[in-house]
Every structure is written in structure tokens, then in C-alpha cells.
């Protein structure tokens, strides 16, 4: 039943997406036909960097992200952007486009393209707020257990009021363990916010997110596994996967993991120190044998 509802939500989101694009095409002031519209320079620029301006559906919320493809020519506000964290969403409205949109031979081709490129996990999208062009960065991680994407993380960039053509960090909802300001300074030096540098910055943040995500997923995927007839059961894991406790049969094991190299640096077995599990977390299942014999 839940799967049927999820599919229905996807269909409805896709229909809204198609309707939005139809309106944008109808409002386009170019001489192109409905099925042949030009790709704006901004799109060409980012496509060359393998970057996309996505407005795709998601299953977890009202997920159609309507964007203004001509951010310097605001249109009629249609509501708040859906799918953005509440700390960010209140700062933005959505404007309908009045200029050319990405040029594909059909609306279906356009939607299919956006669905495919968003799978890479990192995407950019333009946002218009109070006649000012902002840039959004969307970071998405895939949950291998639920076979769904987690709710996205967002970073919003604003144009500098002091330096023409320079972007500045505005708002974000990244976890505290992501050194976003350090990454921004490292890549851009606060002076070079070229398209390629913005993508490098986004990829650096995504890499940090993915590292923690993969570590947590690793421990969660062990749930229910057996070692010599003793079942693994996860009891506790923090949001970074650094402090983990689990049951192996009747035994309670607690470990601490180093964030830098994913090495287990401390281990207790039923409350007593044990060095048998020290080493890479990804070899932990092989080392279980040494503590349960």
C-alpha cells in the first residue's frame, strides 16, 4: 500500500513538473516553437562542468522544486520552495520563468534528463529572491537500506554586494561536522567563486557527507548477521558512526572509531578493555571470530 502511494505521489509530482515547464514555455519570449527552445547560457556553462539545475520530484515531501530560469527577470510569485530545510525555505519565494528554458525536443526529454543527472548527488539550481539571483547547492545521499534518497542538504549562495561577480555563503543546513567555511575558504579564497570552484566546493562537502554516511550505513547493514550462530544486533550509533555499541549473541561490545581513517581505536567487551577488534571498521566481521571462540 505504501509503495502504491509513493508511486502515486511521484506521478503527481511529475505532472506538476510538466505543467510548470509548459507554463514556462508558453511565457517564453523567444521565437522558438513550443518544442524547440534555446538553452540559456547559464545552463550551457554548468552543463559543461557536469552540473545541473535540478527541479526534480522527491518521495519524502511536497517535492516539486519550481525554479525561475530567468532569475534577473522576476515573474509572479507562486509560493515557497518545497523540499528546502525550514531554516532556509522562509527566505525564498518561487517566481515563474519568463525567458527561455533548457532546450530539449520535448518536455518528457527535459524531465527525464533532470531525473538522471540528479542521481549524481550534487546539483545546483538558481533561485530568485527580491529580484536578486541566488544560487542553491543540493547534496543528496542514497540510503542502501531503504533504497531511497535521504532528505537533501542545501547550501545557498548570495551575490556579494561589495564585489561584482563574487558569490558568498548565505545559509545552509549541513551537519556541524562539515567544515563548510573552511572548505569555502580553501577552494575560493573568498575571491575566486568561478563555476568550477563552486562545484569543487560542493564536491568537497559531499565527500565529507558521504564518508560519514557510508560509515553509519556499514554498521547498520550488519544488523541481523550471524557469526558462529551469534546474531549481531546494533544497540546504539551516534550520527557520525564514531561511537557504536552492539550485541553479539549475549555479549555487549562498544567501540570508538577515529574519524580520519575509520580505524577502531578503543573497544570494550562486556565492560572490559579488548584490543581484538582494533583496526579498520571494514574488517570487523573477520575479527569477530577472535572474541567469540
From Swiss-Prot:
Comment, domains: The D-RWD region contains a double-RWD domain which is involved in the interaction with other kinetochore proteins.
InterPro entries: CENP-O
GO biological process per UniProt: cell division; centromere complex assembly; meiotic cell cycle
Subunit structure: Component of the heterotetrameric kinetochore subcomplex COMA, which consists of AME1, CTF19, MCM21 and OKP1. The COMA subcomplex is part of a larger constitutive centromere-associated network (CCAN) (also known as central kinetochore CTF19 complex in yeast), which is composed of at least AME1, CHL4, CTF3, CTF19, IML3, MCM16, MCM21, MCM22, NKP1, NKP2 and OKP1. COMA binds the centromeric nucleosome-binding protein MIF2, and to the outer kinetochore MIND subcomplex.
Alphabetical UniProt keywords: Cell cycle, Cell division, Centromere, Chromosome, Coiled coil, Kinetochore, Meiosis, Mitosis, Nucleus
Stretches the record annotates as D-RWD: 107-293
Broad class of the protein's primary localization: nucleus
Protein's name in the database: Inner kinetochore subunit MCM21
Record-stated family: Belongs to the CENP-O/MCM21 family.
Organism, scientific name: Kluyveromyces lactis (strain ATCC 8585 / CBS 2359 / DSM 70799 / NBRC 1267 / NRRL Y-1140 / WM37)
Location(s), subcellular: Nucleus; Chromosome, Centromere, Kinetochore
Amino acid at each position: 500500500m505504501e509503495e502504491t502511494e509513493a508511486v502515486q505521489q511521484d506521478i503527481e509530482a511529475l505532472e506538476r513538473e510538466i505543467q510548470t515547464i509548459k507554463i514556462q514555455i508558453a511565457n517564453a519570449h523567444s521565437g522558438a516553437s513550443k518544442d524547440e527552445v534555446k538553452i540559456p547560457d547559464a545552463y550551457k556553462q554548468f552543463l559543461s562542468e557536469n552540473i545541473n539545475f535540478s527541479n526534480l520530484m522527491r518521495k519524502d515531501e511536497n517535492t516539486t522544486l519550481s525554479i525561475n530560469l530567468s532569475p534577473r527577470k522576476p515573474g509572479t510569485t507562486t509560493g515557497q520552495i518545497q523540499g528546502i530545510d525550514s531554516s532556509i525555505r522562509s527566505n525564498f519565494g518561487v517566481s515563474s520563468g519568463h525567458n527561455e528554458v533548457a532546450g530539449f525536443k520535448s518536455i518528457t526529454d527535459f524531465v527525464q534528463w533532470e531525473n538522471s543527472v540528479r542521481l549524481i548527488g550534487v546539483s545546483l539550481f538558481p533561485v530568485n529572491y527580491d529580484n536578486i539571483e541566488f544560487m542553491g547547492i543540493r547534496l543528496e545521499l542514497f540510503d542502501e537500506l531503504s533504497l531511497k534518497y535521504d532528505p537533501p542538504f542545501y547550501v545557498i549562495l548570495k551575490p556579494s554586494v561589495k564585489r561584482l561577480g563574487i558569490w558568498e555563503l548565505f545559509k545552509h543546513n549541513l551537519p556541524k561536522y562539515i567544515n563548510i567555511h573552511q572548505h569555502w575558504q580553501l577552494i575560493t579564497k573568498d575571491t575566486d567563486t568561478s563555476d568550477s570552484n563552486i562545484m569543487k566546493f560542493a564536491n568537497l562537502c559531499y565527500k565529507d557527507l558521504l564518508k560519514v554516511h557510508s560509515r553509519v550505513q556499514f554498521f547498520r547493514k550488519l544488523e541481523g548477521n550471524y557469526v558462529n550462530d551469534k546474531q549481531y544486533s546494533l544497540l546504539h550509533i551516534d550520527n557520525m558512526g564514531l561511537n557504536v555499541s552492539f550485541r553479539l549473541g549475549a555479549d555487549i561490545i562498544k567501540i570508538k572509531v577515529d574519524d580520519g581513517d575509520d580505524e577502531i581505536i578503543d573497544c570494550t567487551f562486556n565492560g572490559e578493555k579488548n584490543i581484538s577488534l582494533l583496526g579498520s571498521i571494514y574488517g570487523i566481521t573477520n575479527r569477530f571470530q577472535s572474541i567469540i571462540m
